[in-house]
From Swiss-Prot:
Keywords: Ribonucleoprotein, Ribosomal protein, RNA-binding, rRNA-binding. SUPFAM superfamilies: Nucleic acid-binding proteins, Translation proteins SH3-like domain. Pfam families: Ribosomal_L2, Ribosomal_L2_C. Transmembrane segments: none annotated. One of the primary rRNA binding proteins. Required for association of the 30S and 50S subunits to form the 70S ribosome, for tRNA binding and peptide bond formation. It has been suggested to have peptidyltransferase activity; this is somewhat controversial. Makes several contacts with the 16S rRNA in the 70S ribosome. It comes from Bartonella quintana (strain Toulouse). One of its GO terms (molecular function) is transferase activity. The gene is rplB. This is Large ribosomal subunit protein uL2. Residues 222-277 are annotated as: Disordered.
């Protein structure tokens, strides 16, 4: 993928850098694999704000992406690569030999016309899905299951990947982008390759409006609020908050660990925090 730069005919175009998507399909998504999506504006079923700084944005329709790859042993051909407004990665429309259509996350180096398959013993090439226990050590993978049959949960964002660095006793060791190393069952499925659109990390919106198009509202600092709204609020003139950084609910932020799932601690061999010491 390449970047697109613009002549600064307007101030918002001067710093604008976006990913060139000219290689993607320009038509509509497959209707049978698409559903309507209503905007929540960060509100729950009571109408109360549960996710701040969300709302507005362009209307979207949801694409059903197959994260499980349950159709095993059947070859599929890549029909086209598409843009998906609901995620940073691109998606690929594939057609199985029996005619069924499906969307999957598009990995890097997957092109239109390529043939892919999911199964127990398949070639190690981008787009193919197989159990982790059958992959060679060192394989770059994405869309990794954490529980067999649950569907991929790890490494689904643009440009992300995990690496299989070891195995033993029915488990495999994965190294994640964060530096964490964790054990996962060898019967969990994953897809070979890294996720498409790695240049997403280098885009520059150029203006606030582009964030608004995505449904992102301005992120207001606590020190700019009143005392009723935030622990850092209030004070005469500009203040620094007067205490260690906290959330609007008084919880310590900037580094405090919040993980509380002790049942799965035994699967984490090397935490992401150890890398920073």
């Amino acid at each position: 993928m390449a970047f697109k730069h613009f002549n600064p005919t307007t101030p918002g175009q001067r710093q604008l850098v976006i990913v060139d998507r000219s290689c993607l399909y320009k038509g509509k998504s497959v209707k049978a694999l698409t559903a309507g999506l209503s905007s929540k504006g960060g509100r729950n079923n009571h109408g109360r704000v549960t996710a701040r700084f969300q709302g507005g944005g362009h209307k979207r329709s949801y694409r059903f992406v197959d994260f499980k790859r349950l159709k095993r042993g059947v070859f599929a051909k890549v029909e086209r690569l598409e843009y998906d407004p609901n995620r940073t990665a691109f998606i690929a429309l594939i057609r199985y030999e029996d005619g069924q259509l499906s969307y999957i996350l598009a990995p890097q180096r997957l092109d239109v016309g390529d043939s892919i398959i999911a199964g127990s013993n398949v070639d190690v090439k981008p787009g193919n899905a197989m159990p982790l226990g059958n992959m060679p050590v060192g394989t770059i993978i994405h869309n990794v299951e954490m529980k067999p049959g649950k569907g991929g949960q790890i490494a689904r964002s643009a440009g992300t990947y995990a690496q299989l660095v070891g195995r033993g006793q029915g488990m495999v060791i994965l190294r994640l982008n964060s530096g964490e190393q964790r054990l996962v069952s060898g019967s969990c499925f994953a897809t070979v390759g890294a996720v498409s659109n790695p240049d997403h990390a280098n885009i520059n919106d150029g203006k606030a409006g582009r964030s608004r198009w995505r449904g992102k509202r301005p992120h207001v600092r606590g020190v700019a609020m009143n005392p009723v709204d935030h622990p850092h609020g209030g004070g005469e003139g500009r203040t620094s908050g007067g205490r260690h950084p906290v959330s609007p609910w008084g919880k310590s932020t900037k580094g405090k660990r919040t993980r509380s799932n002790k049942a799965t601690d035994k699967f984490i061999m090397h935490t992401r925090h150890q890398r920073k010491k």
